[in-house]
Amino acid sequence: MGFLFGTRPTPTSIVNREDALPGRDEPILPHPAPHTVLGTPIDGPWKDGQRSVVVGLGCFWGAEKLFWQIDGVESTAVGYAGGYTPNPTYREVCTGRTGHAETVRVIYDPQEVSFEDLIRTFFEAHDPTQGFRQGNDVGTQYRSVIYAQTDDEVQKAREIAESFSHSLADAGYGGITTDISLLSDTPTKTMYLAEDEHQQYLDKNPNGYCPVHSTGVACR
């Protein structure tokens, strides 16, 4: 069956470990430059008290901009998490053979913005019911994910998702497909930084195109 109007079918599963690309030992971005908007390190060291959460909500360019604009967020970086391939490249992730999602690591001050508020922003900024796609972006790398640091954060995120699922259902949407788990429970237990050209992409390329795909449903 051919593709219609340039579209392609949505994948139904993530690659397994045995079929994933081998990757490499060396990081793709060994010496990252400071954040082009916030002026802070994007790969540490972090200040005492700072917290982090890794999220994926489709194309990471627009997602990163969404979070760096939030008061209390002190750094952001884009990368790849949730899969098997160590230190993957963007091209490799786009093949669907790494198992990774495009993600944003958000470093924040919990005295200024709460984990819960960041998660509510996350859910409101995309359609978490679409499985392996966001809008016209199709592939397992565009799946919805939350990779938290603690069991308590996982529980809080799941409670918010459960509450939001009722609002989505009332608006005619299907079930939430977001993977909510500990980053330490993912196969590689980390987020690998993406190439420099992808870091703060929409600051470096103000006319770049990468919209968020909000449902318009409030997450309370």
Curated annotation (Swiss-Prot):
The active site is at residue 59. One of its GO terms (biological process) is protein modification process. Keywords: Oxidoreductase. It comes from the Bacteria. It is an enzyme of class 1 (oxidoreductase). It catalyses: L-methionyl-[protein] + [thioredoxin]-disulfide + H2O = L-methionyl-(S)-S-oxide-[protein] + [thioredoxin]-dithiol; [thioredoxin]-disulfide + L-methionine + H2O = L-methionine (S)-S-oxide + [thioredoxin]-dithiol. One of its GO terms (molecular function) is peptide-methionine (S)-S-oxide reductase activity. One of its GO terms (cellular component) is cytoplasm. Its EC number is 1.8.4.11. Pfam families: PMSR (PF01625). Belongs to the MsrA Met sulfoxide reductase family. NCBIfam families: msrA. Has an important function as a repair enzyme for proteins that have been inactivated by oxidation. Catalyzes the reversible oxidation-reduction of methionine sulfoxide in proteins to methionine. This is Peptide methionine sulfoxide reductase MsrA. It comes from Corynebacterium kroppenstedtii (strain DSM 44385 / JCM 11950 / CIP 105744 / CCUG 35717). The lineage of its organism: Bacteria, Bacillati, Actinomycetota, Actinomycetes, Mycobacteriales.
